Every structure is written in structure tokens, then in C-alpha cells.
């Protein structure tokens, strides 16, 4: 199973873009060359601000959604300290179903 990553890219005007991928460097290069998300095209210099492995695609999609719901301040804390990322991931883990 290929691991998935959550990443945040900072634009020249200090906005944070959140995405997921299986290859952070490849995806960052796509964004840099204008072949990534439309939201980042024409935004000037892009900087990879944060990336972390999250597990499978399903978990990555849920983590991306949750991070996109955070305030700018919370995202900045995540970038600066990784604040709460482990807790966020653990809250997204689905509990195992036990059979009798």
C-alpha cells in the first residue's frame, strides 16, 4: 500500500493551500510549474510549508477535509509546531469492529 501525505503550500500572499498526495515532491513541482491545482496558478512563489504522512487515501481525504476547516491561526500553528496533528489523525481513525 502506497502511503499518502497531507501537505500545505504557502503562496506569495501568505495564504495556505492544503492538499494530499502519494509523492509530496512531485506534487509540489507540479504546483510550481503551473500544472497543479488551479487555485495556485499565478499566485507567485510557492513554498512547501508542511507535510506529514497520514496513512491510506481514505484517511488522507478525511485529514485534508479537517485541516481545510481549521482557521488560518490553527493552520499556522500546525505549520509552526505540528500542533495537534497527531491528535487530529487519531480522531479520524475508524475504530475496529469486533466480532463475537
Curated annotation (Swiss-Prot):
Domain GIY-YIG: 2-77
InterPro entries recorded: GIY-YIG_endonuc, GIY-YIG_endonuc_sf, UPF0213_domain, UPF0213_GIY-YIG_endonuc
Secretion signal, residue range per the UniProt entry: none
Pfam (any one): GIY-YIG
Gene3D superfamilies reported in the protein's UniProt record: GIY-YIG endonuclease (3.40.1440.10)
SMART domains the UniProt entry points to: GIYc
Family: Belongs to the UPF0213 family.
The name this protein goes by in its record: UPF0213 protein YhbQ
Organism: Escherichia coli O157:H7
Gene: yhbQ
Amino acid at each position: 500500500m502506497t502511503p499518502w501525505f497531507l501537505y500545505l503550500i504557502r503562496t506569495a500572499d501568505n495564504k495556505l493551500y492544503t492538499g494530499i498526495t502519494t509523492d509530496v515532491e512531485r506534487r509540489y513541482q507540479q504546483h510550481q510549474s503551473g500544472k497543479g491545482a488551479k487555485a495556485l496558478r499565478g499566485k507567485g512563489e510557492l513554498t512547501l510549508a508542511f507535510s506529514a504522512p497520514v496513512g491510506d487515501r481514505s484517511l488522507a481525504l478525511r485529514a485534508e477535509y479537517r485541516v481545510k476547516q481549521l482557521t488560518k491561526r490553527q493552520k499556522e500553528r500546525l505549520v509552526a509546531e505540528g500542533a495537534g496533528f497527531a491528535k487530529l489523525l487519531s480522531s479520524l481513525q475508524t475504530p475496529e469492529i469486533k466480532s463475537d
